[in-house]
Amino acid sequence: MELDTDPTKLKAKPIIKPKVEPCDDDDELPPPPPPASGSGEDWEATTPLAAGNPFFTALIAKSHLHPKFQMWIPPRFQHRLAEPEARTAAVLHSGGKSWATSYCGHLKMKKLDAGWSEFAVDNRLLVGDACVFELVAMGAAGGLEFQVQILRGGLPAEVVTSKGLTSDQPILIVD
């Protein structure tokens, strides 16, 4: 999918200078679990939203928020993105605002790095929220733009306790 990102053809948006930081090694998190079903694992990555753009979803976990604020790109979506030699600028749009971040495409586990923390903090993301990342532009030089929809989730306040923090104290859901 090649979308034109010529600045003269895009809607006017505030200019954001990306914060440049080195990409960390990608061995900090374990690889994602294997897909639950054999034929439907690509559904999220290939089902278009209203605009017909590819997207992926992420259920916000503790690892997305603490300590390094990194958003890992699902492997089933990575084939839609260019394979840059190193870090590439990416912009996240949500709620009429924009955040500059970096796409680390040269790592085995692709991720959004620098700038993701500002997005997560500014949008008050919590464990249990979900984000839908719609790829709205991909430049020839590798720049990416995502429109992000935030779906608030989480557990009701009456069930939030220390249970569920470890496998020794699971949260039990009874029908």
Swiss-Prot record:
GO cellular component, one term: nucleus
Top-level division of the source organism's lineage: Eukaryota
Keyword terms of this UniProt record: DNA-binding, Nucleus, Transcription, Transcription regulation
Region (Disordered): 1-45
DNA-binding region extent: 56-154
GO molecular function (one): DNA binding
Subcellular location: Nucleus
InterPro entries hit by this protein: B3_DNA-bd, DNA-bd_pseudobarrel_sf, REM16-like
UniProt entry tagged with the keyword DNA-binding: yes
Protein's UniProt name: B3 domain-containing protein Os06g0112300
